[in-house]
């Protein structure tokens, strides 16, 4: 089958934003203008096409990133038809993992900001993640019709808070109720969209006289930014003081792709203004798959690094970036094709798991409807139905051309709760449901507590777990009770100690004998999970076949902790002496001896309890400021700064997670629902002694 759209006309983009910046509405409008969606879905009515899970529609926030394909040839049909694959990403901080996954497979991103609240804490998180994956991006300042909206203030925030070289390509005409349209600074014309046909048509007009001077100044800055793209443009600009419109576009494109500048556009998706021009900018300034760095991976030896280019003739390689369970077809595995092509019915290799997968049916998604396809080519994003062993982050490649593409890193969960099925019938269903949810979401973990036999689920925040329990009820019809949230405490030693571990058992016949001296010290990276183990034994005082057992004894004891039963972080252990018995020594005896030595860290290692500290940002009306700060102080919070934005005062604080349970409800009642907050994991810090004693005592009595 021949390629319908040349790869140079593909755009794989993500639309990222803070919770209320209006990202879903923006995506909806994109689908409307590109002709796929006939009635515009409003999030206010809970009917947006992209938000396809019931909870998303109720809560009005996007949880799963659905991938959608649409086509666009420009507001005035001035381009050849381009294929735009949009990955919708969630904006809530509990779902940062989804954003990270999406950014991994995108080539470019549109960051949507709210014209009045501007750069929010979640924006900073998304921005950092986009920097990590070097994703070229542009900004769409949405909600220009909102009270307090100010386009140029948001441009300043981009520079100050995110350190971005923001270059406006437009200026908004009016704001709040007076928002009329935008000025295109390249053409120096006003664009006014027609409200009667929901913005499908528009007029170009002269720039309002009172804005002319400001627009000329902004244009000058934009032309300067474009001229810095290369020497040729710079020379022309210095000689003539001007560039042609095509040269400006070329310069801005080059610098956007190089991640040197961030073009900024404005509009109001809700009022059908500006999204059409934003789509044009996606085509003009964001990269095709062939214009980003070729993806790298490792070959079968696990060391040699190879590249795969966006080319249909190269061997097939793809990355699975999302698993979703669909009530009608079962498991959908979303994947991005980096190189080569694939027909349905072909067998592939999952190189991470080392297992074969047969691709039966493939579909391409439009928000919540799907089209079955027979073939995918380089640059495509599609979903395969019924893969058995593939999970998020796995590589799929041609059987004869092994490669493992760069893996994704997933954060450790910070909050756990016990779940208990309400009836015997729910018990079995709950196991299946939790298994499926964990397969879809790598930041969600399920385990059974060995001592209590309870099922414990862990995730990135209260909202994250609420939604998963909610999905269990709706999608899998499992009724469950939720226990009190448990905090993921950790332990760490603070001083160096040399400890003897000796395990001797004589009981007639063959005995047991293991004897070690171990130096324990805090590792350089105090938050490192896992053990840094050094063997300094000389002269075989402990035979080398027992050394792995010593390491295992220490690391198993690390998992169970030494003070209160929580895993130890940042431990370095060096075995430097010991002794053995020709007959009685064995691996088990040395493992127990090492474990006994590790347990003694409670007395000798200055072991302390660590608690997760959260970075909390509260936006509150001024009159509630005192209550909010007082409440955070009561929760052992450390106020780190105060700021203000149009939506009110902003309080930044670091607060222990243990004190943040139920905070959403408390904040709502203290401020009549006018304040909002976001919270994300910051670091582990030593718990105050009174708190630590309480937790240790609780764990000893086994409450």
UniProtKB/Swiss-Prot annotation:
GO terms for biological process: ribosome disassembly. It is found in: Cytoplasm. CDD domains: EF-G, EFG_III, EFG_mtEFG1_IV, EFG_mtEFG_C, EFG_mtEFG_II. GO terms for molecular function: GTP binding; GTPase activity; guanosine tetraphosphate binding; translation elongation factor activity. Residues 8-290 form the tr-type G domain. PROSITE patterns: G_TR_1 (PS00301), G_TR_2 (PS51722). Keywords: Cytoplasm, Elongation factor, GTP-binding, Nucleotide-binding, Protein biosynthesis. GTP binds at residues 17-24, 88-92, 142-145. InterPro entries: EFG_II, EFG_III, EFG_III/V, EFG_IV, EFG_V, EFG_V-like, EFTu-like_2, G_TR_CS. GO terms for cellular component: cytoplasm. It holds the Pfam family GTP_EFTU. The keyword Nucleotide-binding applies. SUPFAM superfamilies: EF-G C-terminal domain-like, P-loop containing nucleoside triphosphate hydrolases, Ribosomal protein S5 domain 2-like, Translation proteins. It comes from the Bacteria. PANTHER family: RIBOSOME-RELEASING FACTOR 2, MITOCHONDRIAL, TRANSLATION ELONGATION FACTOR G-RELATED. HAMAP family: EF_G_EF_2_B (MF_00054_B). Catalyzes the GTP-dependent ribosomal translocation step during translation elongation. During this step, the ribosome changes from the pre-translocational (PRE) to the post-translocational (POST) state as the newly formed A-site-bound peptidyl-tRNA and P-site-bound deacylated tRNA move to the P and E sites, respectively. Catalyzes the coordinated movement of the two tRNA molecules, the mRNA and conformational changes in the ribosome. Belongs to the TRAFAC class translation factor GTPase superfamily. Classic translation factor GTPase family. EF-G/EF-2 subfamily. This is Elongation factor G. It comes from Teredinibacter turnerae (strain ATCC 39867 / T7901). The gene is fusA.
